[in-house]
């Protein structure tokens, strides 16, 4: 497994390969999936965290079933640009996942993704209980959509 930049990913992806987005939390892992044309990110049900080994098994089974080509994982950078404990935990998660899969991981700045997801769910008039259930996957979808938009721009620039 390697960590790639979004530019490196753009060079290695084949047509019709899907990408998964992850929002790593302490209790859940938000999950989103791209379509095969890599234009749209769709939230998927969250993964309830148990222990790393079980979390990894669930994530890798999902990746195999959905034929995931890469993971875009939100990197929780502080507003001042520094990396706090959550960013360190995310990097440690990716390092440990690297021992279990050859799939590449791409870090994506997730600043304000949860705020944007919360706002979108509020605009859709989703109840407080349902918002709590869906917020992590909605945030994963925002993270993935940002990466997909960047991939699209890189592809257009290369043509």
From Swiss-Prot:
> What Pfam families would the database entry show?
RuvX
One GO MF annotation is: nuclease activity
Q: What is its EC number?
A: 3.1.-.-
Which UniProt keyword terms apply here?
Cytoplasm, Hydrolase, Nuclease, Ribosome biogenesis
Q: Where in the cell is it found?
A: Cytoplasm
Q: What class of enzyme is it?
A: hydrolase
Query: Which SUPFAM superfamilies does this entry report, sorted A to Z?
Result: Ribonuclease H-like
Reading the lineage from the top rank, the first entry is: Bacteria
Query: Which GO CC terms are listed, alphabetically?
Result: cytosol
From which residue to which does any coiled coil extend?
none
SMART domains hit by this protein: YqgFc
GO BP of this protein: rRNA 5'-end processing
Relate the protein's function as given in its record.
Answer: Could be a nuclease involved in processing of the 5'-end of pre-16S rRNA.
Family listed: Belongs to the YqgF nuclease family.
Against NCBIfam families, the record matches this protein to: RNAse_H_YqgF
* Name of the protein: Putative pre-16S rRNA nuclease
Annotated source species:
Agrobacterium fabrum (strain C58 / ATCC 33970) (Agrobacterium tumefaciens (strain C58))
């Amino acid at each position: 497994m390697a960590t790639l930049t979004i530019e490196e990913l753009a060079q290695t992806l084949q047509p019709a390969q899907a990408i998964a987005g992850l929002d790593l939390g302490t209790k859940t892992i938000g999950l989103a999936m791209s379509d095969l044309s890599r234009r749209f990110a769709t939230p998927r049900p969250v993964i309830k965290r148990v222990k790393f080994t079980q979390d990894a098994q669930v994530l890798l089974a999902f990746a195999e079933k959905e034929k995931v080509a890469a993971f875009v994982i939100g990197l929780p950078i502080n507003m001042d640009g520094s990396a706090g404990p959550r960013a360190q935990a995310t990097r440690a998660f990716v390092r440990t996942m690297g021992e279990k899969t050859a799939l590449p991981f791409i870090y994506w700045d997730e600043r304000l993704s949860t705020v944007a997801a919360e706002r979108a769910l509020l605009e859709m008039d989703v109840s407080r209980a349902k918002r709590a259930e869906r917020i992590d996957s909605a945030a994963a979808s925002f993270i993935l959509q940002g990466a997909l938009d960047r991939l699209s721009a890189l592809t257009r620039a290369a043509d």
